[in-house]
Amino acid sequence: MFLSVVVPVYNVERYVGDCLCSLLNQPESLCEIIVVNDGTKDNSMEIVHKLVNGYTNVRIINQENKGLSEARNAGLRHALGEYVWFVDSDDTILENAVEYLHDIVDTYPCDVYASNLLIKNEKTNEQYLEFAEFFSGYLPTEQYGEKYNGTTSQRYIFRKKFLIDNNLFFMPGV
């Protein structure tokens, strides 16, 4: 399995359908989708179950509410993919995104990949590209720190072994 996409779910009935639809349109042979039910109290999981019915590449993990970080960590622990992508339930990904990532990984093998984000303001419907300068290949750490300040996890695709071997998990309670 190339990629595990971890989607934490907690009271996101307004968004989770769009998120899952964008993920379910990716090739089943390349990715698994791990939905982590973090004890949601709304109808999010009913929406999830309805959408994922019949898909063999979707797994659902149920846990009591422990917060976003612990939900992501649970997904990481269950991930079967060589790479892991943490996608929040109010995010959508572009069509062919997983195939594109697969091609990039084949061309430029490394432990962490960073991507652009298209941010949409819900109130104004304005959109802007964060991380607008595109690069491909390798970027030394010191140059990355000078140019980019990207702290959102959905921007990064990680080699699972890199995270596990270095004991890199999300900090509980954050």
Model-derived features: where do they sit?
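Conserved donor NDP-sugar-binding/catalytic core segment of glycosyltransferases
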Residues: 98-127
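A conserved acidic beta->alpha catalytic loop
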Residues: 22, 37-46
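Conserved nucleotide-sugar donor-binding catalytic segment
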Residues: 141-174
